[in-house]
Amino acid sequence: MIRFDKPIGTYLLLAPALWGLIIASEGLPTPFLVFTFIVGAFVMRSAGCTTNDLTDRKLDGFVERTRNRPLVTGEVSVIEALCLLFGLLGLALWLVMQINWLTVQLSFIGAALTIVYPFMKRFTHLPQVVLGMAFSWSIPMAFAAVTATMPAGLWWLFLANLL
């Protein structure tokens, strides 16, 4: 469910975070923030995959690409998957609490986007917009982590990443 063997999702989540950190810090983010965002990207990508697997578990058995996922095969129970999800979200919260209050506040929006995305596949033909917002949300978080503010210019980077 964490998908250690498919790191591209973590890289795609991490890239905007690093752009935000580098731009907000004018080229030299602290090693602490870089490390925290690297770990955070992995943890939140894993939480997103777990949420997606939980949400789609009744459909995944009908799709060739997803029919062998642990929830579909019974290798992992729903309770175990929920424990994993809450553990990942708890770890993400602990990580972000090491930064500053504005970043913590923004992280709740990021978590909400992560949790809502799989459900959007049922209600809209453009769930990728929500996924793009989730993947781009690390940009405002990075600016908040570096500057403890939300400068207006960060939204141009957010929009460029979203599109």
Regions found by a protein language model. Name each.
Residues 3-23:
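The first (N-terminal) embedded transmembrane alpha-helix
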Residues 156-163:
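Faces of alpha-helical transmembrane segments in polytopic inner-membrane proteins
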Residues 69-156:
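Intramembrane alpha-helical segments
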Residues 20-32:
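Short, hydrophobic transmembrane alpha-helix segments
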Residues 1-9, 73-75, 121:
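Membrane interfacial helix-start motif at the N-side
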Residues 31-38, 74:
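Loop-to-transmembrane-helix transition segments
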